[in-house]
Each structure stands twice: as C-alpha cells, then as structure tokens.
Amino acid sequence: KVEDDGSYEQVIDADGCVVAPGLIDVHVHFRDPGLTYKEDIQTGSAAAKKGGYTTVVTMANTKPPVDNVETVKYIIEEGEKTGINVLPAACVSVGMKGQELTDMDALKAAGAVGFTDDGIPLMNEKLVYEAMKKAKELNVPLSFHEEDPAFISENGINAGAVAKELGITGSPALAEDSLVARDCMIALHTGASVNIQHISSATSVKAVKLAKELGADVTAEVTPHHFTLDETAVLEHGAMAKMNPPLRTAKDRAGIIEGIKDGSIDMIATDHAPHSMEEKA
C-alpha cells in the first residue's frame, strides 16, 4: 500500500492495472521514412504509448536506410512530436549492403544511439570486426540479426517437423547458432558491447551464456512470440506465424524461457514490424 504523503492534483483509479515505470522497447520498426503505408513514427509511437512504452529504439531498415545524418535527424525531429522517446539506431554498413562501414562518428554525433543492419545479417567478418572496434571506441552498442543465408533455402519457418509436413525445407537453427557463436567471440576479443537480436534457438542461448561467463559484453533479446509459441503455430495461423528468425521447436522455446530465468537473456523486445496484409498473404 502506498501511503498518502502529501497533496495531489489528480487521483487515478488504477484498480486492476499494472503500475510500473515506462517500458523500454529496444527493437521496433516504425517504417518511417519511406515505408509509411505500413506504419509511421506517429502511429507507431501512439501504439507504444497505449502499451505503456515511453522509450523505443527504431531500426535502420527504412527507405532510405538510416546510414546518413539527415535521416537520423528526421527520425529525431518526428519523434519529438510524439510524447515518447524515439531513439534511432543507425546502419552498420552503407546501404545495409554489408560491404562498407557507415560514418559511425557522424551518425553518433547526430543522435544515433547504436548501430544495426537488422533484417540483414552481416556476413563480412572483417567488417564486423572493424565495426566492433569502432563501436568500442565510441562506446555505443551494436545489434545483430543472426541468420546465415548459406544454411537457409526457405526462410520464415523452422527446418523441422512442421516444415517437413508442409513439404518445404525451412530455416535451421544452425543458421542462427553459427553467427551468434562468431559474433560472441569477436565481441569477447574486441570488448565491444554487442546485442544478439530476437534469439530463437536454445543453442544460441547457451552460446550467449558462455560468452558472458568468458567476459564478453554481450546481451540478448527475445520476442514475446519466440517464448510463447513454437513451430506448430504455422499449422494454425499459416503465413501470419512466419517470421525471421522463425518460431522453432518446443525444446527451443523451453531453452529460451530458461535463459530468461537465469539471466542469459537480458531483454524482452517486441520486434514490432508491421506489414501490409498483401505482404503477409
């Protein structure tokens, strides 16, 4: 019970509500600029406020990508109109092509709070290494989408029993596990602050746990759907249950829940990423 400690202007009846500090979502796609037929900064922020979120970090895969100072400033200016904190992450690579580092100094100075090519995995290990060294110098985090396309023939669904039942190959956990292991070790050797995005594999959770034990500055996030659903959801919901990385096995889901409990996973992030109905069909 909160004791009455003085005068007040308003009494809010919060019976049946959860009273908490404003929530923070480190992984949202507001599709602005360039893809605003799906969402924009104003509508995304309104939805965030409705859900109790007062700070969000927007991903960089807009059109154009957030690889330039002008787009960073645009997101900040639009965010200031919303009533919540809208913090832009900028691209690691120019055009999200994975070949050349962005001007991370200038992007940070413009207001970028971190760097990510979310949606596209970075396959150039040398570029990842250089990005981590620069991020360490600037004291900013990097966030990585970990799916090696070399192991994936059909994305959106786990390579497992459900995919086999549907007559497709799917995306194996190996695609995630291999890049998580790589980036955890590069993080260990560079001292960079690295976040593993939307983790979906129990083995990847163990890799993050090991990296932390070795002293790496690594964090991991998980989405609500990856710890509440598994690959069988595709049979019920069809394309609406397809995503990257995919929903995996019940064993993976259990491993993720255990990772939340033991601290291997640090954050629940929504990966709020609206699409049109035509795109999801």
Spans of features found by a protein language model:
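Gly-rich Lys/Arg/Thr-decorated short loops/hinges at beta-loop-alpha junctions or inter-strand turns
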Residues: 25-28, 53-58, 85-87, 159-168
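Divalent metal-binding segments
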Residues: 29-38, 57-69, 89-101, 116-127, ...
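Histidine/acidic residue-rich metal-binding segments in metalloenzymes
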Residues: 101-268
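Divalent metal-coordination and catalytic microenvironments
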Residues: 16, 27, 48, 52, ...
